[in-house]
Amino acid sequence: MSTRSLVALQVGDHFESIYVHFDGYLKGVGQSLLKYTTYEQVADLLEGGDRSSLDRDSCYGDSDVLRVHRDLDELLAESSVFDYVYVFMDGEWYYVTSNTPLLKLRGAC
């Protein structure tokens, strides 16, 4: 069973994101994302497109095109489709689930 997540980056006034199929929970993808601390690092992560997992250099499907969202509201509207949505903005990681508001991602979740 997979825990689906979306990983997004604020780029100016819009957001770009990729899909991560496995381990989307806080102790999986959430903890892995904490090692990406700069805009450049996150942009490099997203560059490869959708992935099976963050822990392995593996693509998911044939999509290397980033999803583009006009604003945070449009991005968060997709939160019901994914178990977790992770967002890097203003130098910090945040997350949301279908039943939580936008929360700051912290270590040792």
What are these regions (language model features)?
Residues 4-9:
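Short beta-strand scaffold segments in enzyme catalytic cores
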Residues 15-16, 84:
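A generic secondary-structure signal marking the coil-to-beta-strand transition
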Residues 34-109:
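Low-complexity intrinsically disordered segments
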